[in-house]
A protein has these predicted regions:
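Active-site phosphate/pyrophosphate- and oxyanion-stabilizing loops and adjacent acidic/basic residues
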Residues: 78, 136, 186, 225, ...
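A short acidic, glycine-rich active-site loop
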Residues: 62-75, 211
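Charged docking surfaces used in two-component/phosphorelay signaling
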Residues: 95-103, 238-248
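Short glycine-rich, flexible loops that bind phosphorylated cofactors or substrates
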Residues: 24, 124-125, 177, 245, ...
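Small/aliphatic-rich secondary-structure junction motif
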Residues: 2-63, 163-211, 224-234, 288-289
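Gly/Ser-rich helix-loop-strand patches that form or flank binding pockets
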Residues: 1-6, 11, 38, 105-157, ...
Length: 298
């Protein structure tokens, strides 16, 4: 395990928000506007009229729904302009037709989007919360960073605001994919004046004075040895001998009242890999977190 030698500066130039114009989309909208304003980035507000539901209804019905979406976009833009929310922001509304993720992915590539804000209503399944289908596709397949405001995210304050006593949580298992997100976590903490808590969960129950526990704690300190964190970080090793590791991460996040969680994801191009491995833990955290979660693809 080597120390992180430098810190990246994620200079975001473009932010994408996928919206359905519903009341539930207002919180992700506030986050997206705040992030774009902080970085001076262009914000794209996109709505895709899914062609899936209009297969039998025909092209006229699809075009009618698209025109209605354009009117909704115009009303939203008018409201945001009148409130001053768009003042000084370079912005663009995009209305598309087709398979939702395919259209969004095309926008990401064409506009070189650096971060997509992923809002979701979510739904409850057996013993867990699930993201909606489009939100899940964004989480699993987007090449850019994904800022997910999950179904359990209750925070009113935006994670992008510079406020005193902010806390960001970086959860790592020390894999290459996980540590790929660390420089971004350090940069975000510095950007927003937050304390960064580095967390590792041991899936065993060693004594806190054992070599395994000590090595994990030392590992957290080592990866930040050459960093330039403005606020002194905190290092936490939790034990999870039973149950999912995600539950311990969520429990720690709640106890510390964190404002943002940052995690790394490995890259996969295979749809078959989208079930639960290797991103099961991150997916469960996104679904259950009471704050937004940023995931960074390796």
């Amino acid at each position: 395990m080597s120390a992180i030698a430098s810190v990246v500066d994620p200079c975001l130039k473009s932010v994408l928000l996928a919206t359905d114009f519903s009341e539930a989309s207002q919180n992700p909208l506030r986050h997206a506007l705040g992030i774009a304003r902080h970085y001076g980035a262009k914000i794209y507000l996109a709505h895709v009229v899914s062609s899936l539901g209009f297969t039998l209804a025909g092209a006229d019905a699809l075009n009618g729904a698209t025109e209605a979406a354009k009117r909704d976009a115009h009303h939203l833009e008018t409201r945001l302009v009148e409130s001053g929310a768009l003042a000084g922001l370079h912005h663009e509304f995009i209305i598309g037709q087709g398979a939702v993720w395919e259209v969004l992915n095309r926008i990401i590539k064409q506009e070189q989007v650096d971060l997509i804000v992923n809002g979701t209503h979510g739904r409850r399944g057996l013993r867990k919360v699930l993201l909606g289908s489009v939100a899940e596709q964004i989480f699993r397949y987007a090449d850019c960073m994904v800022f997910t405001v999950g179904p359990g995210s209750y925070q009113e304050a935006r994670a992008d605001e510079i406020l005193p006593n902010r806390t960001f949580l970086f959860a790592t298992d020390f894999t290459e994919a996980s540590l790929h997100a660390l420089p971004y976590a350090i940069s975000y903490a510095n950007q927003f004046g937050a304390k960064l808590v580095l967390l590792h969960v041991l899936p065993t129950a060693p004594n806190p004075k054992s070599l395994l526990y000590t090595a994990a704690l030392q590992g957290l300190k080592e990866v930040t040895r050459n960093s330039t964190l403005k606020v002194k970080p905190e290092f936490v090793v939790e034990l999870c001998p039973t149950g999912p590791i995600s539950e311990k991460i969520l429990e720690t996040a709640e106890q510390l009242k964190v404002d943002l969680i940052i995690m790394g994801l490995c890259r996969s191009r295979h749809v078959e890999a989208s079930s639960h491995v290797p991103w099961g833990t991150a997916y469960e955290v996104v679904c259950g977190a009471g704050c937004p979660v940023v995931t960074v693809r390796q």
